[in-house]
Curated annotation (Swiss-Prot):
Compartments where located: Nucleus
Organism of derivation: Rattus norvegicus
The protein, known as: Transcription factor GATA-4
Record keywords: Activator, DNA-binding, Metal-binding, Methylation, Nucleus, Repeat, Transcription, Transcription regulation, Zinc, Zinc-finger
Tissues expressed in: Expressed predominantly in gastric mucosa and at much lower levels in the intestine. Also expressed in testis.
Any one GO molecular-function label of the UniProt entry: DNA binding
Amino acid sequence: MYQSLAMAANHGPPPGAYEAGGPGAFMHSAGAASSPVYVPTPRVPSSVLGLSYLQGGGSGAASGATSGGSSGAGPSGAGPGTQQGSPGWSQAGAEGAAYTPPPVSPRFSFPGTTGSLAAAAAAAAAREAAAYSSSGGAAGAGLAGREQYGRPGFAGSYSSPYPAYMADVGASWAAAAAASAGPFDSPVLHSLPGRANPARHPNLDMFDDFSEGRECVNCGAMSTPLWRRDGTGHYLCNACGLYHKMNGINRPLIKPQRRLSASRRVGLSCANCQTTTTTLWRRNAEGEPVCNACGLYMKLHGVPRPLAMRKEGIQTRKRKPKNLNKSKTPAGPPGESLPPSSGASSNSSNATSSSSSSEEMRPIKTEPGLSSHYGHSSSMSQTFSTVSGHGSSIHPVLSALKLSPQGYPSPVTQTSQASSKQDSWNSLVLADSHGDIITA
């Protein structure tokens, strides 16, 4: 069981054992002050601490084995004249073990005082802490094996000779800050967080919004979203600054006159008719304002509009609904006959009324011998109304016609035949009447 301890101890000390600032560097036994050969203190490597039999209930035996191994490992590396059997650990008992620092070699200039040794231990502990944080768990195990001064060991409590160093870090820092409070009372440091006038970049003018009494040198504005400066350093409002930056000149203070609408142009009068009310103002060839009526008249006719056409009121266009013509059906005069598709009774009644009205409008001359031929005048008028389909278009023609018993002039006959192309029986009726003459 102890062969592994001896083999691990013979492999050499752990890394950092030969450091000049380490707490165990060049430590010797009590009688090694005059020896020219220096043997480092044998320490248990970190690989041994990970063994399971060194923890738990057998910690006391492991402590004895460790101390025995330490004392027995000394002669293996010692030269002639080295005192053997002087352990680096003076263990009085299993529970009351305390570390006694060995004497320092006279060849080195380290004074054997507790303060210098504490400083060296502090430097070594700092290096070990850095190595532990960077190397992970393996370095942590090595650090646990090398920290013999401030941690309880296997089964015994080791009293540390450096209680001040191992105290609370926060308390030590607070005490150090309180002891050295003089440098922190510098007015330079105290003025950093609470300066009354914070420095700003000269190009950033956004902080100037909160300043009081600032006025634009161009337009006199007291408030603006962003204060700007001109080339001479004077303050300009955002509008004046942008105008000066884009155009290179100062922003004009007089606003341009806003163009009034046609209904708000007060003071204008037509150069032709002198009216002051119009829906649209126009200009003539000379550039003078004229009303809409005079302008359109001059544009269409090329001459000025006569003053007699002037009206006090404005004539507007009477617009009709677009669907008005679609809803209405074509209407004729009261004497108009219905289409032939209607009933026979309605057709005959309409034909009678149309014939009576047509007879009243036009004079008809007949001879006594030919009266029998015109006994059915209603049928003849019905023929004309049926052919035309619209009484309004045929009535003026019938009103200008006259029937006379002097022969058959050809123009009237051709006109009647042309109007009755679709009805062949109409020509037969006209052929039977030998005595009527239609003259224009």
